[in-house]
Amino acid sequence: MKRIFCMMFLFALCLTFNQAHAQRCLPGMKGLQVTGGMADGVHWNSKSNFAYYFGAAMSTYTKNGNRWVIGGEYLEKHYPYKDWQIPVSQFTGEGGYYMNFLSDRKKTFFLSLGLSALAGYETSNWGDKLLPDGSTLTDKDGFVYGGALTLELESYITDRVVFLINARERCLFDSSVGKFHTQFGIGLKIIM
């Protein structure tokens, strides 16, 4: 039994030696990422302006760890009105470029600054303008457009799995409830 355990341990040890390290962020590499987090501050109380977001994107790396990103995002914010919460939802598509400006020698951590163009659709109370008390919402549903500035930290857990932490400021014009939204979130990226 001891011999079998020792052989299995040596076999597992040999599996780790054939991997090339630091083969990260090479031009042409692609990654699929999923992110989510809080928007416009952290509000856990149901009577406050609770807001969250989640999204998915595809990254394609270029030289020096820089990357092109294309994806989609959903943001929902609740506005209190009497005893109700009125949801405002934004569905946006993103296309942008993220520039790596800081990384360690072992290529484990990358800090990037990204600039993206956003376009999408915004709806208030899912299109229902008449509230239960007879009031009418004056916010109009419609298309929104703008941009986002993102600061993102990538931390490689393995050569194919990346943990993400990001902070982002979105500016969307033609929004009926506010142009700016600050987002803080985490995510996971799988390198393909």
Name each region found by the language model.
Residues 39-51, 81-85, 173-181:
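Solvent-exposed loop/turn segments connecting transmembrane beta-strands
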Residues 20-71, 77, 189-191:
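Short glycine/proline- and aromatic-enriched beta-strand/turn motifs that initiate or cap beta-hairpins
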Residues 75-78, 152-192:
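Predominantly the C-terminal beta-signal and adjacent terminal strand-loop region
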Residues 137, 144-151, 155:
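Acidic, glycine-rich flexible loop segments
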Residues 1-29:
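Cleavable N-terminal export/targeting peptides
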Residues 57-132, 161, 190-192:
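Gram-negative (and chloroplast) outer-membrane scaffold detector with strong preference
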